[in-house]
Amino acid sequence: MSTELVEDETQFYGKAQNYWKNVPATVDGMLGGYGHISNTDLNSSKKFLQRFLREGSQKTGNTCALDCGAGIGRITKRLLLPLFKTVDMVDVTDEFLNKAKSYLGEEGKRVGKYFCCGLQEFSPEPSRYDVIWIQWVIGHLTDEHLVSFLQRCKLGLRPNGIILIKDNVTQDGSIMDDADSSICRDIDLVRKLIKQAGLSVLAIERQENFPDEIYQVFSFAMR
């Protein structure tokens, strides 16, 4: 379990919130100085997501998506708005959501709702979303809160809806990052927590062409 790395839950969440308050509301800020990987990231995410949006009896709809840990809307703008009629955004940092309204431009009119909230306290509206996208943010949740959040996300899905997690993982034990107060989980633990939440993994994909110094990034699709 990775929660043993969290000695004080209140401090764990408070420190992360303070960290993000001091991060510039830019793409480079959202990516911790790795803004140059954004195109590679988004292109891979689009290919991964589109396999579920194609024709077929289990096809995922394109009515509404939710961007979790949305920041200024990097993923909303380049990945979700081009594919979905409406996108909702949730982030713990109010300044980022305010910036999103200008960053998203004209297409931002199709953002349905902005939620300023930590994911540990957020409950998606039942049966609203075709896709719930959770990228580079599960490390800011304890194991217990991640499981309960995924359970709430499951209730938020429309028929044939899917939840997608994209995040850094390790292969040999979870690691705490004291700088931003987050946990990089072992990939086996991520799979275990997904199962604990009552979800089934549909596909897993490793991100290619990222800098060597970054922990490996994997995408998980589930319902």
Swiss-Prot record:
In the Enzyme Commission scheme, what number(s) does this protein have?
A: 2.1.1.244
Q: Which InterPro entries match?
A: MeTrfase_NTM1 (IPR008576), SAM-dependent_MTases_sf (IPR029063)
Q: Name one GO molecular function term.
A: protein methyltransferase activity
Q: Name one GO biological process term.
A: N-terminal peptidyl-proline dimethylation
Per UniProt, S-adenosyl-L-methionine binds at: G69, R74, D91, V92, T93, L119, Q120, Q135
Q: Which Pfam families match?
A: Methyltransf_PK
Q: Does the keyword Transferase apply?
A: yes
Catalytic function, reaction form: N-terminal L-alanyl-L-prolyl-L-lysyl-[protein] + 3 S-adenosyl-L-methionine = N-terminal N,N,N-trimethyl-L-alanyl-L-prolyl-L-lysyl-[protein] + 3 S-adenosyl-L-homocysteine + 3 H(+); N-terminal L-seryl-L-prolyl-L-lysyl-[protein] + 3 S-adenosyl-L-methionine = N-terminal N,N,N-trimethyl-L-seryl-L-prolyl-L-lysyl-[protein] + 3 S-adenosyl-L-homocysteine + 3 H(+); N-terminal L-prolyl-L-prolyl-L-lysyl-[protein] + 2 S-adenosyl-L-methionine = N-terminal N,N-dimethyl-L-prolyl-L-prolyl-L-lysyl-[protein] + 2 S-adenosyl-L-homocysteine + 2 H(+)
Q: According to the lineage, what is the superkingdom?
A: Eukaryota
Uppermost EC category: transferase
Asked whether the keyword Nucleus is assigned, the reply is yes
SUPFAM superfamilies cross-referenced by the UniProt entry: S-adenosyl-L-methionine-dependent methyltransferases
Sorted alphabetically, which keywords does the UniProt record give? Methyltransferase, Nucleus, S-adenosyl-L-methionine, Transferase
Q: Which family does it belong to?
A: Belongs to the methyltransferase superfamily. NTM1 family.
- Full protein name: N-terminal Xaa-Pro-Lys N-methyltransferase 1-B
**Originating organism:** Xenopus laevis (African clawed frog)
Q: Which gene encodes it?
A: ntmt1-b
